[in-house]
Structures are given as structure tokens and as C-alpha cells.
């Protein structure tokens, strides 16, 4: 009984290292993109900001979700896994299926955060964050995918993608709270989420 626990803890330590690398690289890249990218034109209009968010989401969908669908389809077509009902699955196919499912979940969160962030960013300089964030998110999806093919721990290389979506949603939630009740509204809404997160964390210990 002791051996699996030891292996699990070793995997977790490796995963934490991968997460640290992911966060450092992602933050550095995001800051560089925001600094080097020229300001977007015409961002004083809400419709223009929503259009930018929609374009970014379309690109992200193509390079992540559609890529995952294609990977699974090609694997089905060219291997003994052709008939899903037969249950023949290679390790590569199982990883691709996990990537596809995870990306489907993550892209919903990302989209909500992206459009919400674009709603509140009212200048061309600030709106550089939208394509910069999209670029970093896409790269994190690929890092998750490639890392997962190496080991379960190495999928942590893409964890910054989830952090990006969460940060955007927290920013939007804070702004919504401020719109409703000023600073107290922000504190209440963000505080409620953090309390929920704490409960979920404690329940799994």
C-alpha cells in the first residue's frame, strides 16, 4: 500500500516543478507581448472590443479544440481504435481524449473571462492584453498536451493557462462587484469565491 503513495508524491513534486516553470515563462511572455505589441486602434467602442475578443477566441478554438478533435479523428482512422465501441485505445489516444475533454472545459472558462475582460478594457493600450493573453493561453494548451504525453506530472507545464482564465474571471467579478456596490461589492464577490475555493481545497485534503 505504501508504494503507490510514494509514487504519487513523487509525481506531485515533479508536477509542482512543471507548474513553476509554466508560471514564470507565461508571465514573462505575457509582459513582453503587452510591451512590444502596438496599441489597438478604435477600442473606445464596445463593439470593437467585442470583435477583438471574438477573433481571438476563434483563433484559440482552431489551434486547441479543433486540433484536439483532429488528433483523435486521425488516431481513430489510422489505428485499431477505428471502432470506438470495441474499446481499443492506445496510450496516445487516451491522452488525446483527455486533452480534448480538458480543452473543452477550459475554453468555456477562457471565453467568459476573455469577453468580460474586453468589456472592461477601454483603451487601445489596455486591450493589448486580450491578444497577448490569448497567445499565452494557446501556448499553455500545447504545453499541457505535450507534457501529458510525457507523463501525468508534466501536464503541469500548461497549468498557467487555467490560471490565466481564473485571473480574468476574478478581474471581471471584481469589476462587476464594484459596478453594483463599489469597493464593498468587489470585496464580497471576490471573498465569496475565495471562500468557496478554500472549502474545496480543504475537502480534498
What do these predicted ranges mean?
Residues 19-36, 61-72, 170, 187-203:
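Hydrophobic core of alpha-helical transmembrane segments in multi-pass integral membrane proteins
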Residues 24-26, 91, 157-172:
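Small-residue-rich segments of transmembrane alpha-helices in multi-pass membrane proteins
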Residues 28-32, 166-182:
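Hydrophobic alpha-helical transmembrane segments in multi-pass integral membrane proteins
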Residues 101-116, 167:
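Core segments of transmembrane alpha-helices
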Residues 130-165:
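Alpha-helical transmembrane segments and their immediate juxtamembrane interface regions
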Amino acid at each position: 500500500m505504501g508504494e503507490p503513495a510514494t509514487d504519487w508524491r513523487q509525481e506531485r513534486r515533479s508536477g509542482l516543478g512543471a507548474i513553476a516553470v509554466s508560471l514564470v515563462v507565461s508571465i514573462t511572455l505575457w509582459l513582453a507581448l503587452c510591451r512590444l505589441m502596438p496599441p489597438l486602434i478604435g477600442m473606445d467602442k464596445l463593439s470593437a472590443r467585442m470583435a477583438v475578443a471574438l477573433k481571438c477566441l476563434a483563433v484559440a478554438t482552431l489551434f486547441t479544440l479543433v486540433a484536439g478533435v483532429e488528433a483523435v479523428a486521425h488516431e481513430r482512422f489510422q489505428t485499431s481504435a477505428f471502432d470506438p465501441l470495441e474499446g481499443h485505445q492506445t496510450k496516445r489516444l487516451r491522452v488525446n481524449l483527455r486533452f480534448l475533454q480538458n480543452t473543452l472545459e477550459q475554453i468555456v472558462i477562457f471565453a467568459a473571462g476573455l469577453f468580460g475582460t474586453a468589456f472592461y478594457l477601454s483603451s487601445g493600450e489596455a486591450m493589448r492584453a486580450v491578444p497577448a493573453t490569448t497567445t499565452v493561453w494557446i501556448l499553455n494548451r500545447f504545453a499541457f498536451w505535450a507534457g501529458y504525453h510525457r507523463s501525468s506530472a508534466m501536464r503541469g507545464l500548461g497549468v498557467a493557462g487555467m490560471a490565466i482564465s481564473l485571473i480574468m474571471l476574478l478581474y471581471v467579478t471584481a469589476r462587476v462587484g464594484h459596478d453594483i456596490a463599489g469597493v464593498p461589492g468587489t470585496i464580497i464577490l471576490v471573498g465569496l469565491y475565495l471562500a468557496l475555493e478554500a472549502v474545496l481545497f480543504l475537502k480534498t485534503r
